[in-house]
Amino acid sequence: MPRFKIFIIFAKTDAGRKRSARRWRDCHKNKNIMQTKNHLSVLVHNQAKKYGDREALIYKDFGGKTWKSYSWNQFSQKVKTVSNALLNLGVKPQENIGVFSQNSVQYIFSDFGAWGVRAVTIPFYATSSEQQIQFMINDAKVRFLFVGEQEQYDKAHRTLAHCPTLERIIVFDNSVKIDPNDPNAIYFDEFMKLGENLPRQTEVESLYKQANLDDLANILYTSGTTGDSKGVMLSHLQYKAALEANHRAVHVTEKDRVMNFLPYAHIFEKGWTLLCISEGATLIVNTDPKEVQKSMRETHPTSMCAVPRFWEKVYTGVQEKIDNASTVQRKLFRHALAVGRKHNIEYLSRGKRPPLALHLEYEMYDKTLFSLVRKQLGLEKTNIFPTAGATVSAHVEEFVHSIGLKMVVGYGLTESLATVSCDRVGEQPYTIGSVGRPIYNIEIKISDEGEVCLKGDTITKGYYNRPDITAESFDEEGFFKTGDSGYIKDGELFLKDRIKDLFKTSNGKYIAPQMIEAKLLVDKFIDQIVIIADQRKFVSALIIPEYKLLEEYAREHGIQFAGREDLCGNALIHKMIMERIETLQQQLAHYEQIKRFTLLPNPFTMESGELTNTLKMRRKVINEHYKKEIEAMYAE
């Protein structure tokens, strides 16, 4: 059956206002994806048959300094050992198993090993609080919990008394000090001995045959910006559909070396990692997120998925070096960036061939200046860099493309098993500011209220133990309501903001805070920012400065300070930051521009409840914590 697309556009005039709803769907169905009995339980073993002793995983031990590796055959053997050990512990099909750890190879073995016995894995963020893990363990009735390092073990151990179903804690890191009075905890190495020599492999293989695509693979609890915790159910059918769709849209190959640094508890990294495994790529497992740039320089990945904040840091770092360079060097680099922008964005992104003279000039800069920048990042030989999770500033997106890195901007949710849409860099024209074209086999509808709604094989069937919220999350046509406002133009999806985050000023103007925040986060002096505007006369902001740079600026300009509070209250500092804000917000409408701001001495944190585990702002909590500072900005 041929593959084809259908756009259905509905429009009518209502009191002089044009209203439209757009739908996109790729109608082709792949029989292998829809009907096969193979699911994630056998993925690694199939790849081992294909790739054998080729390198599959590159990693460091917990606290280790040296990079090590596993071949595909070794990877497969470890997964089988986990499956056998789980059977010896008494794990049943579709039983829920928790994984509370930072990224590690043990984490990957545990995921695939659990799927091998048709169990369900529930990833917890390594930064989760005791209250959060207690809720998830009790909600999902978890008996067995894998944990990473000392922090995770200590939290799990203290939670035991409040979790009646929890029987066993399995500790990945051998350096963790297990409480001598804790009979429930064992090290991962001890656990693996339960599956040594694969004593129950016949039963494991029988479970492979019984597996079906309706089996749950994961339950991912999303705390969200409101604080409500919901377990998103993801099946093997969703994963198979997602792998097929992303295979068509995102071209990672067996030649790629892929850095994993976002948490495996994040659906973006989890989905991306499984795609890379399914394509035969080599994974580089980064355990400590703070070490990612060091890891990149040591291992030279060709691809990785990232959130916009990563590229914002790269952008501000390069801009700082440009600002500190000589006049001649500064002029040269800015000209090179202008050439890169013209070549890669004005021509290539629009599907046009650059003029020969421009191409030759770009090639010169690409092999000199831009290659030096990429080398500093450890990105000498590169493929693609999927980026999602928040709004990407146009400045940052243009910069990344200009220096010769293929940023693939996309959009997705946990409920859609990551990708809904993404750029097709090098294949189809893409627009800076869009989140790309819808992926294969997903239907997008823009509701009358402007909400992005989804239907397709990658969409969750609902929330674990929450039929009430599940029912509220789908419309009468069976479309999942994302909560994001957006529109489709020329086949590309554009997002505005979270519907619940859209502010309406007291003058009746609508403000999209994430868009404004993304514009300002490119400034090197701004580390965090929250826009305030709802039912207010004008837009204001709470800003956490990048204090290391701000302190350097103060010393260079003779500004006396004893601590951060002095910097926050200094008039010269305020004047400097306001001037930088005014430069960045020139293209915003007058009513969108920040009129006042307050500098805060301490960052927004997960521990304070101001950030989610994915580092998104909990605006309600921040508004409550800084009510006094906010009211002061609006005082006459």
Short names for language-model regions:
Residues 69-72, 217-243:
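Conserved AMP-binding A3 loop
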